[in-house]
């Protein structure tokens, strides 16, 4: 089953601020996650149904939520990992 991709409005703004290369790297990984979104190693503690995609070379993270009822992956936050700021923003949304 393939999931659809959605963005929270605030995550969409963060996405649009990313450079072309970073967006392309995330797109490739998101395409894989649309087929199989639940990767246990990437589950976020304290945030049910939320997972991360990390670009190790650049230090960027993308946090998404899996919504099975609507067959949707919703991007919650995108940003640098610096002091876990991307994860803190994701928790607040």
Model-derived regions: residue spans:
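Enriched for short, Lys/Arg-rich terminal
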Residues: 2-6, 12-13, 17, 24, ...
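A short, surface-exposed loop/turn module that caps and links secondary-structure elements
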Residues: 31-56
